[in-house]
Amino acid sequence: MNLILQVVVAVGIFLIAVALGNTLDYWNRKLYARMQSRFGPLLVMYAGFRKVLGPSRILQPLYDVAKLWGKRTIIPGSSRKNLFKVSPVVALLAVSVAILMTPVCDLTILGGLSWALIGLSYLIMTVSLFWIIGGAASSSPWGAIGARREAELFLGCEIPLITSLFSAAILARSLSFCDILNFQRGFLPIILLNPFAAFAMFFAVLGKLHLKPFDIPDAEVEIVAGPFTEYSGKLLSVIYFTRMLLFYLLSTVFVDAFLSGGLFFKGILYPLNILVFLGLCFLFVFLLSTVHAAMPRYRIDQAFKFYLKYIWPVAFAGLTLSVILVSTGVV
């Protein structure tokens, strides 16, 4: 019975991830368009489509996934076919398991494991690694260039991402996500104790999500879609779905690691935590979208130098601050 309950909770968490990932992705698109004063397709939509899709475009990310799923999948003849086909699937599996390690208002399956943060870090890395492998296996020059850019960006943003998460773990004296939440609930949000780690994490997320100024791997005007250029049909649908879930995952990880997971109320007011959690996720995406709309694209060498010169030192300063706070008994 316990196993059945865990399966039900896991399915529930995944459905929450799909719903919230879709909404956050839509929110990012909407904000980005508004900041650039662009109009959406609703103004020129056929009347027959409006009856099916409704007046809102909030499900547009899922529409994109569903549309691509119905398209024909073309595998390049000169590609490493097995690697090319399996890479998007492994990336999707990695982000799906990572979602189960990330609490949503105390709701989690694997977040209480003593090594949850280590597993989460490896799974987040796995997504980028298999995108690199897929692009390199495509035999396309655009895919190869995109894979190389993805690899360089991976080296730049992965260190501050992991360092920031471990800065939070040091303060909580645990690698369990549930313990990190409980620490913040009984003390202060970690963003107040260690703003350096939160700052570094924010810029690392920009790179992981390929948002400006770090959208170099799949810059459309330069290399079409980068490592995803040769993907089509169901495989491209899987990639879109993975990116949507990654939007949810990284937003949730930031809120959990630095903003108490939105758990500020107890007792009869506990349901308000759900609204706080959602509000913090939307606020985080708003900040991401603002930077995305305001910044031009860096060259890959500029992006790597930016991370190496500014974000890495801030991330290591956050790690040092966490060690000092713990060793001096402040926390």
Predicted regions span which residues?
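Alpha-helical transmembrane segments of multi-pass membrane proteins predominantly involved
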Residues: M1-V331
